[in-house]
Amino acid sequence: MLLLNKRYQIIRPLTINITRQTLNNYINDTTLIDIEKLIKLSELLKRNIDYFYKDNFVFGNYLFRSDSEVDNITKVKFEERIRKYIEVEKLVGKKTIPYMLDVYLEKLDKEFIETIAQNLRRFWNIGLLEPINNPINLLELNGIKVLQFSSPDHEISGFSAFNDKIGYCIYLNSNNTIERQFFTSIHELAHFIFNRKDYKTELSAKENEGKEKIANYFAGVFLVPKDSLNKFVEENYFKKIDFKEVCLIKKYFNVSAECIIKRLFQEGKIDKANYEMLRNEANEKVGSFGEREPIEKKDFIDNFRFNNLVKNAYMENRITTSKLAELLNIRMDEANREAEKWLN
């Protein structure tokens, strides 16, 4: 809950572009404050942004695991959106706490990880040979909350959070390529499976490189299973694999060139020299955060499940247009246009 004491009612609401009533709603915790206004408020009161949350963040032990240091503003923005997600789930009666495999693993065991990946694919009824069209949709279909918004730092590819009450939540940096977001989503899934007890204390990849290797290997074999990769290579008569073949394979599996090159090397389809040559070619002109022949962003919808839940809540008259604007973090005129589009 926000620590907006009554003494802050002396603030002129116009200084942060809100009405006095809205400020009172923030104080009384009847309206969620959006991150942009919270930043302005923190600057006005000369307080760090985490000051406004009890015990630093609203979920207490709902801590974050990430492969890069995450600033408090990004964490608060994530928690703000998770609270909206939970709110709209309750409105439409769609709250889910998924069943999750729980296998603690500290050291890389490739055979064991492949077995777990195969078991989960079976459990989620996706088979062992078929490519996954959209891993993010797959996670959300199985009760994992995924939220996407932009961060200027490409090093922050994503992070995850968990507790028994709220469940499993993943953030993905929407500034990154679709392929990178797909891989990151399954990387974070691996942490839920193999490192769940680590969410009791905040960790980073730098503190435990071994657990990142486990998560990366799981993501690779889950998205590109060995038998499926071998079958595709054999059926297409790839005797020598150049970058042209890499692009064909990556498009089939909906992953990055980097992921495919690594899986080809792991399965003995290319040698070390070819592996290095293909990696260099993959990064040529686009850098390590770009993608050659990428999945088009226009074919991909951010926050698909959350937006559909909001739409359902509005269509069922469970929320007003102003609440729609608040949940989607858009202006009232945009909310009116969106509502009109849904109704027509």
How should these model regions be labeled?
Residues 1-344:
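Active-site hotspot residues in diverse enzymes, especially metal/ion-binding acidic/histidine motifs
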